[in-house]
Regions:
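Hydrophobic alpha-helical connector segments
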Residues: 59-62, 70-101, 146-153
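Amphipathic alpha-helical packing segments from all-alpha helical-bundle domains
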Residues: 66, 73-75, 97-106, 116-141, ...
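Short amphipathic alpha-helical boundary/capping segments
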Residues: 44, 92-96, 140
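Helix-turn-helix
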Residues: 13, 17-55, 59
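Hydrophobic/aromatic-rich alpha-helical bundle segments in the mid-to-C-terminal region
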Residues: 118-123, 127, 139-191
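N-terminal intrinsically disordered/low-complexity leader segments
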Residues: 1-9, 191
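Helix-loop "lid/cap" segments that line or gate small-molecule binding pockets
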Residues: 89-96, 103-114, 183
Length: 191
């Protein structure tokens, strides 16, 4: 009897392997051979699921973004203020998973400058994230311009995250969280 393969599961495994290789070696250093080896598969298997490296990179970015987005639904039982804090905290590179996500996002942001599909993926992710934050902020008392506040918070988190990526010793998780809380407090968004 032929073996049944879950195509989406296999593609997800390959994308996770690609993310790990990109985190170690960068986009240019992430060869199809290295990604296949990281996943424990052959390049022939990889080619069966992705026509080329660009397709794999786009899928890898989308998968990373979808994992982050899926975490938002886990916060539906929290108050808007608590969900906002949890969402922003979970976006910071305070653990291996979010650090890899940020490395992939930043690495592929450079490629997105000349690749309209990658640019669209990045743009759509930010629009979705902004919309989610606006929804939370709109339901919080005292927030008069939710869209402006959402943009400010995205800038705050992105700034902290980039500093933490480039200077992990200087920006350990504790410092990232203090900076986040200071930014929220400045806007009177924490209790």
């Amino acid at each position: 009897m032929p073996k049944i393969v879950d195509v989406e599961q296999r593609r997800s495994e390959l994308a996770e392997a690609a993310a790990r290789v990109i985190a170690r070696a960068g986009v240019d250093g992430a060869s199809m051979r290295d990604i296949a080896a990281e996943a424990g598969w052959t390049t022939g298997t990889l080619a069966h699921y992705f026509a080329n490296k660009r397709e794999l990179l786009d899928f890898t970015l989308r998968a990373s973004i979808e994992r982050r987005s899926a975490q938002r639904s886990e916060r539906s039982d929290l108050s808007p203020a608590d969900a906002l804090r949890a969402t922003l905290e979970s976006a910071l590179p305070t653990d291996d998973d979010t650090r890899v996500h940020w490395i992939v996002t930043v690495a592929l942001a450079g490629a997105a400058a000349s690749d309209t599909d990658l640019a669209a993926t990045q743009r759509d992710a930010y629009r979705d994230y902004r919309g989610y934050l606006i929804g939370l902020l709109s339901s919080m008392p005292g927030i008069h311009e939710p869209a402006t506040e959402a943009e400010r918070l995205i800038g705050l988190v992105d700034g902290i995250a980039l500093q933490a990526l480039f200077d992990p010793e200087g920006w350990p998780p504790e410092r990232q969280l203090r900076a986040l809380d200071a930014g929220l407090l400045a806007a009177s968004m924490v209790r």
